[in-house]
């Protein structure tokens, strides 16, 4: 199987369970919302410094369990976060563990930060991708990076929630990058059920990140939910990957909503 399997979780105990179930794990994705759900964070409030210390402790534990894998660690970025602030956070987080991919949002500032970071050898995972144009912008902004250094994370479930076929986005990104140099890998994210997981395997996504519940269902060969029939398809766009990244339309309401949600979950952990 060419597709790598990641666990989507901010809990090292789930990493242990996934390793026990699957025998191997290629990586893990974390984000502020998942860290806020970590059992050790429940009902607690931290200073900003303590939150980062807690996040570091969690990813260090995960990294120790899957030292050969990738662990995605997300910067705190709201719509006003400056490029320099993202870069500085990313550099700091990159020192936490030797196998990190730093998650940045697909916004103008996020892409500028990513472009600078890959030139310094820092690996990135560009998150909250909801359009093929956003994925193309990631490719163009990170030119010169090597395979394995850049992930783009199309979010399936959140498009499905809007009655749009999120799997089409994954398929279109995989197809588009066939014409590229291979430096960006498609990391299918926001899988909601076993159908999503299996469909991404079939369409050849480079990586799939799924929660523990779905990985268990997959391993146990549980019944697969029916393909939804009420979703609006997403047509393929013929995009020129050689264009400057600034020429692609990177705006999407779900990217903005996703950033707001991550920030809100993070802020709830912090003492007023």
Feature annotation, model-predicted:
Residues 23, 65-66, 120, 141, ...:
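Structural motif
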Residues 235-272:
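C-terminal extensions of enzymes
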Residues 17-18, 92, 116, 137, ...:
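Well-formed, non-transmembrane alpha-helical positions, independent of function
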Residues 60-64, 95, 143-144, 171, ...:
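Generic secondary-structure signature for well-ordered alpha-helical cores
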Residues 108, 125-239:
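Catalytic alpha/beta core domains of metabolic enzymes, predominantly
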Residues 1-6, 11-15, 21-25, 30-119:
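Active-site beta->alpha loop and helix N-cap motifs at the rims of alpha/beta catalytic domains
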Residues 50-70, 94-96, 115-124, 167-182, ...:
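Alpha-helix-loop-beta-strand connector modules within alpha/beta enzyme cores
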């Amino acid at each position: 199987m060419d597709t790598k399997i990641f666990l989507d979780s901010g809990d090292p105990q789930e990493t242990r369970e996934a390793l026990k179930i699957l025998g191997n794990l290629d990586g893990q994705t974390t984000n502020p919302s998942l860290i806020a759900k970590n059992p050790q964070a429940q009902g607690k409030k931290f200073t900003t410094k303590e939150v980062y210390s807690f996040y570091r402790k969690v990813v260090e534990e995960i990294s120790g369990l899957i030292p050969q894998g990738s662990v995605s660690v997300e910067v705190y970025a709201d719509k006003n976060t400056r490029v320099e602030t993202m870069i500085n956070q990313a550099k700091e987080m990159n020192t936490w563990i030797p196998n990190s991919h730093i998650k940045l949002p697909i916004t103008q500032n996020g892409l500028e930060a990513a472009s600078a970071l890959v030139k310094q050898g820092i690996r990135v995972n560009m998150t909250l991708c909801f359009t093929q144009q956003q994925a193309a912008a990631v490719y163009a902004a990170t030119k010169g990076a090597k395979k394995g250094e850049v992930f783009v994370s199309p979010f399936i479930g959140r498009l499905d929630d809007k009655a749009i076929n999120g799997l089409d986005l994954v398929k279109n990104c995989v197809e588009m990058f066939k014409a590229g140099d291979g430096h960006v890998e498609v990391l299918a994210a926001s899988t909601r059920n076993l159908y999503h997981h299996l469909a991404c395997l079939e369409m050849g996504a480079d990586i799939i990140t799924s929660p523990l519940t779905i990985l268990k269902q997959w391993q146990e060969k549980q019944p697969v939910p029916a393909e939804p029939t009420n979703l609006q398809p997403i047509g393929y766009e013929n995009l020129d990957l050689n264009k400057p990244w600034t020429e692609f339309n990177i705006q999407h309401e779900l990217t903005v909503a996703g950033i707001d949600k991550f920030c809100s979950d993070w802020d709830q952990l912090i003492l007023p």
